[in-house]
């Protein structure tokens, strides 16, 4: 392998990490409140609202059901509107984020369902407001499961970023197609694959470690 190929491998790896981490950040910032509301408006919860809960769940389920490659195509006009182009790593972050938001929202709602059922009553008996119940009881109690959800989201996005790269999104997927396939450099495809596997394994290991650290049960 030439120094130029190694340089491209390094750059493509950084692009993949950039897409994965930024899209995960958007998923947390937007998906967490949506998932929280989906849980809080559920039956028997502090903001119980059947209509709002149904609407939120429909939005989340529709968002999760659209295959990423189709979402990528559907969002081309929106991506161009937001970043001015449909090519490159920054452009790829738009569909990656949109796909990850409902995914993480569902993981958040499911994480909150793991909270002991008597916690709300105990908090209310001590005079806690709804805001205090959420910030001092629900979220701290669900941190380990939320960390697992963040890890799962990042791992999924690393895989999606390879698909985005295959259609001009940059990263290791684009490297594998451009050099590994079109220029018949088979070893480039293998290197890109191995690096993606290593990123996923390291992300999972780090996520598991953090979840264990925050789990005080």
Curated annotation (Swiss-Prot):
Keywords: Amino-acid transport, Cell inner membrane, Cell membrane, Membrane, Transmembrane, Transmembrane helix, Transport. Residues 13-207 form the ABC transmembrane type-1 domain. CDD domains: TM_PBP2. It is a multi-pass membrane protein. It is found in: Cell inner membrane. GO terms for cellular component: plasma membrane. The chain crosses the membrane at residues 20-40, 58-78, 81-101, 143-163, 184-204. Its main location: membrane. Belongs to the binding-protein-dependent transport system permease family. CysTW subfamily. Part of the binding-protein-dependent transport system for D-methionine. Probably responsible for the translocation of the substrate across the membrane. PANTHER family: ABC TRANSPORTER PERMEASE, D-METHIONINE TRANSPORT SYSTEM PERMEASE PROTEIN METI-RELATED. This is Probable D-methionine transport system permease protein MetI. It comes from Pasteurella multocida (strain Pm70). The lineage of its organism: Bacteria, Pseudomonadati, Pseudomonadota, Gammaproteobacteria, Pasteurellales.
């Amino acid at each position: 392998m030439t120094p130029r190929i190694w340089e491209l491998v390094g750059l493509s790896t950084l692009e993949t990490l950039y897409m994965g981490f930024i899209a995960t950040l958007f998923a947390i910032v937007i998906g967490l409140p949506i998932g929280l509301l989906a849980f809080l408006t559920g039956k028997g919860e502090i903001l119980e609202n059947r209509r709002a809960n149904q609407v939120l769940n429909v939005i989340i389920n529709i968002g999760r059901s659209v295959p990423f490659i189709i979402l990528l195509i559907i969002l081309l006009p929106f991506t161009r509107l937001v970043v001015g182009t449909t090519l490159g790593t920054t452009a790829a972050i738009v569909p990656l984020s949109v796909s990850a938001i409902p995914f993480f929202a569902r993981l958040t709602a499911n994480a909150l369902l793991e909270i002991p059922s008597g916690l709300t009553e105990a908090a209310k008996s001590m005079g806690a407001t709804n805001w205090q119940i959420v910030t001092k009881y629900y979220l701290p109690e669900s941190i380990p499961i939320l960390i697992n959800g963040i890890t799962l989201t990042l791992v999924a996005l690393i895989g999606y970023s390879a698909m985005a790269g295959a259609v001009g999104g940059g990263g290791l997927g684009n490297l594998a197609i451009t050099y590994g396939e079109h220029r018949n450099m088979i070893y480039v495809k293998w290197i890109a694959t191995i690096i993606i596997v290593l990123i996923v394994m390291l992300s999972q290991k780090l996520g598991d470690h953090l979840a264990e650290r925050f789990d005080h049960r």
